[in-house]
Amino acid sequence: MQERADHFLELVNAGYQALYRVESEAQWLAATDVTPVHDAGSETAGKARAAFVGNPALIRETRALLEHRAELKPVTVLQLEHALLNAAEGPMTNPDLVAARIEAETRQASTLNGFTFHLNGQPITPNEIDNFLQTNQNLSARQAVWEASKQSGPALKPGLVKLRDLRNGVARELGYADYFALQVAGYGMSTAEMVKLQDDFMRELRPLYLQLHTWTKHALAKRYGQPVPKRIPAHWINNRWSQNWTSLIQAADLDDRFKDKTPEWIIKTAEQFYTGLGFPRLPDTFWTRSDLYPVKAGDARKKNTHASCWHLDLNTDIRSLMSVEANSEWFTTAHHELGHGYYFISYTRPEVPPLLRIGANPAFHEGMGELIALAAGQVPYLKSSGILPAEFQADQTAFLLNDALANSVPFIFWSSGTMTHWEADVYGKDLPPGQWNQRWWQYVRDFQGVEPPSDRGEEFCDAATKTHINDNPCYYYSYAIATVLKFQLHDHIARKLLKQPPQNCNYSNNKDVGRFLRGIMEKGGTEDWRKVLRQATGEDLSTRAMSEYFRPLLSWLEEQNRGRQIGWN
């Protein structure tokens, strides 16, 4: 039986890798230069890959082999299970349904990437929206820009309604209850188990979040000269979705430190972080094929502005799509995105078959990027990389507060709360489209303690303004898991390898850290993720490390909030 499986998987891996490359090339073109021709190419390539991975004969043989899993090597079983998950994304038992989904996703991506936002009748780019919310303190102007950022929702909603039904239909072809259930199956979990895990994260971190929320609304009320609200108005926060609360802590605002830097310097410095740990330099093709900087003003080309890293051929062709500018946020983002690139490099080796050139689970990929982003914000590293002067005296509380606000704690309540629960309802409970915006804002209010500045009726679809809702659905819990995971890995590195406090440590040029990270990454998807985590850190997935990292901050917040009403109910 093992010999039969080996022969079968040799063919499957070869076909999968070849068609993955063709589809990725087409998707790259469609993302970096949004045109009808490139959209059509992406759609055609998607159909070709789906025809292979969802072939009924392939599905039958995969299932037949899995009936004998006890006779097969563990890595063989993992490949077969992954092949079946791939097949469930495009089962050719119903080719018309799969074709309709691919066509709908291509149209949705084109609408999303090609949308032009307007403010007072003039075009405004996503980067300009973000920069405005980061810097402007005029509340009426902020509200106008925030509302402009939601303009894409009504344009995207019809396509999203159609896609919800098509994705659920595709998932049900191979026996999954719905598309959300198919996605969480990649973790070996059910929808109920995944939602419970996310609820557990929020329950364990809620005392910290309530203190942070209370401190933040008082700070913002003072900034804007307004009464302290129960819930924070969304346009008070410097992020379109209130997922990260950035630029609140002046002592930790490093943007001025980047004024003499270039976007090229930011990416090269991120690469040097990894080479200092013992990783190789990025391949030359990374620099010649990536799309790293914003489209120049007046250029007619449109591109996807969401930062990402691509493994185009599951081999050596690694690229990144970014819009890097010289500021602290892009400094962090560049370190994060290259984390994906070095994950690709680490598991691209003969021992890891193409089907398993993935993270131990999807969150491991995000977690590795997030871990390096956390390390890139540590004061000792900022000094060693020349951003902060050697004599700089850090306000440790300010940096911890910024860590919590900008990168971690509100993000859990956005990702575990609003995003996960809304998509579980939309896909898992077939929530009627006439209730989508009401349910969205119910969750934003309940989980995040945030409310819109004006009435948001069903003529809007504010969830659809988030990229992932359209092109990476039923996935966002992975970012929450990644956030928890980054603190576990960071805690282990700081305490066990560096013998330094997790809140103030430096990975720079430490080959032990590099070996630890490579030991996780080079496995790809060849081992169960729970086993990988236990082997690396000695513990199961837990918010313990995250809670301990912010324990000094919690004590400070409790002191600051003494006498204030905590929470929003």
Feature map (PLM): residue ranges:
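C-terminal, non-catalytic "cap/extension" segments appended to globular domains
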Residues: M1-R4, P36-H38, L80-A83, A181, ...
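N-terminal helix-rich structural modules
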Residues: M1-V161, T467, D471-Y477, R530-L533, ...
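Extended, well-ordered alpha-helical scaffold/bundle regions in very large, multi-domain proteins
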Residues: A45-A48, G54, G188, A192, ...
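Active-site-proximal, well-structured secondary-structure segments within enzyme catalytic domains
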Residues: Q122-N131, T135, V161-L321, A394-A406, ...
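Active-site scaffold of zinc-dependent metalloenzymes
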Residues: S140, A144-E147, Q151, D299-N327, ...
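Post-HEXXH active-site segment of zinc metalloproteases
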Residues: F180-A181, S323, F344-L371, S385
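Post-HExxH zinc-binding segment in Zn-dependent metallohydrolases
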Residues: Q198-L208, I358-Q396
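Active-site recognition of the HExxH zinc-binding catalytic motif
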Residues: E325-I345, E366-A373, A482
